A protein has these predicted regions:
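Carbohydrate-binding surfaces of carbohydrate-active enzymes
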Residues: 1-90
Length: 90
């Protein structure tokens, strides 16, 4: 799922393949790009993850904790496609 495409059917492809194979774990890299930097809210992240759970994903790989040294000026080192959920978040 992406910011502009939150169709549960798209993510259901992965869970359907896992069911056919007999795999119980369905993993998805999650929350890599929900919106622009520093504009995501915890409620938006929860709604996004709820859609993944509805699609049959049962293992979340959270992509959103970028390292930035304390001495780096705000906003620090930011990865272009990651949620910024860290101590520097406004």
């Amino acid at each position: 799922m992406f910011d502009d495409c939150r169709d549960v059917l798209v993510s259901k492809f992965a869970s359907s393949a896992a069911h056919v194979k007999g795999t119980r774990l369905v993993s998805a890299e999650s929350c890599t790009w929900i919106g622009e930097h520093f504009r995501e809210r915890p409620g938006e992240i929860k709604r996004f993850l709820d859609l993944l759970f509805l699609a049959g994903v049962n293992h979340i790989f959270y992509q959103g904790c970028c390292y930035s040294p304390p001495e780096a000026a705000w906003p620090g080192w930011c990865f272009y496609a990651a949620l910024e959920m860290n101590l520097r978040s406004p």
